Amino acid sequence: MRQAEIKRKTQETDIELAVNLDQQEPVAIETGVGFFDHMLTLFARHSRISLTVKAEGDLWVDSHHTVEDVGIVLGLALRQALGDKAGINRYGTSFVPMDETLGMASLDLSGRSYLVFEADFDNPKLGNFDTELVEEFFQALAFNLQMNLHLKILHGKNSHHKAESLFKATGRALREAITINPEIHGVNSTKGLL
């Protein structure tokens, strides 16, 4: 079973997170940051994974530590659940439209961490969520999953639509990458490991 559960406690956050790559339920997100909960729920639905997150953070400061640390723990959990990555497609790409916005995510579960992020947000806040944290989350996710991740807004105006498009596109690209392909024997690399 491709699943993992991680508990991580620091002086800034206390996080319990569980993933199952081969089940779609349950999805239950509680971070104390409403917009972020919404984005993580969309990410889970579009990647078709089970994801539960219970996070308590120093929200009296702001939501930066909570969002970044959830990205760290989610990346670690996904990496653990993938194991040796035998049989997976490894690569995934998705374009997701949302009204006037078109977002793209392309990723490689290569074991090499890198983020390319091309998105601007006109609105600095969505609820109590700072839009600059979209990049912080994906940076933490990419580096801890050890994934090469390219994100881009091709066009759009509405900040909510832009963020939502990127979370959905990343979820859909991840589903493609983690899917086991019966035509792939071992790992999808000439090196013999990922």
Swiss-Prot record:
Catalytic activity: D-erythro-1-(imidazol-4-yl)glycerol 3-phosphate = 3-(imidazol-4-yl)-2-oxopropyl phosphate + H2O
One annotated Gene Ontology cellular component of this protein: cytoplasm
GO molecular function annotations of the record: imidazoleglycerol-phosphate dehydratase activity
Listed CDD domains: IGPD
Entry EC number(s): 4.2.1.19
Keywords: Amino-acid biosynthesis, Cytoplasm, Histidine biosynthesis, Lyase
GO biological process, one term: L-histidine biosynthetic process
InterPro entries recorded: IGPD_sf, ImidazoleglycerolP_deHydtase, ImidazoleglycerP_deHydtase_CS, Ribosomal_Su5_D2-typ_SF
Superkingdom per UniProt: Bacteria
Compartments, record wording: Cytoplasm
HAMAP family, A to Z: HisB
Family annotation (PANTHER family): IMIDAZOLEGLYCEROL-PHOSPHATE DEHYDRATASE (PTHR23133:SF2), IMIDAZOLEGLYCEROL-PHOSPHATE DEHYDRATASE HIS7 (PTHR23133)
Protein name: Imidazoleglycerol-phosphate dehydratase
